[in-house]
């Protein structure tokens, strides 16, 4: 019975690690990448980023209220 709890705990830790990477780590890296490279990306890089946005959409939605990727104005007006 004790090995069952050890296996369950190990499985729970593994799931938490995967969920953390999927919902937190990779979306934050993707936001950072898009924010720094948006105006200099080539077409294949942009296509790859669009694919990653599709793949990691749930994590990006979690951070969308807090991160701002709007264009910065020229400061005139």
From Swiss-Prot:
* Keyword Transmembrane helix found: yes
Q: Where in the cell is it found?
A: Cellular thylakoid membrane
- A Pfam family (short name) is NdhL
State the membrane topology: Multi-pass membrane protein
Q: Which domain of life is it from?
A: Bacteria
- Looking at the UniProt entry, the stretches that span the membrane are 12-32, 47-67
Keywords linked to the UniProt accession? Membrane, NAD, NADP, Plastoquinone, Quinone, Thylakoid, Translocase, Transmembrane, Transmembrane helix, Transport
* MF terms in GO: oxidoreductase activity, acting on NAD(P)H, quinone or similar compound as acceptor; quinone binding
Name assigned to this protein:
NAD(P)H-quinone oxidoreductase subunit L
Q: Which gene encodes it?
A: ndhL
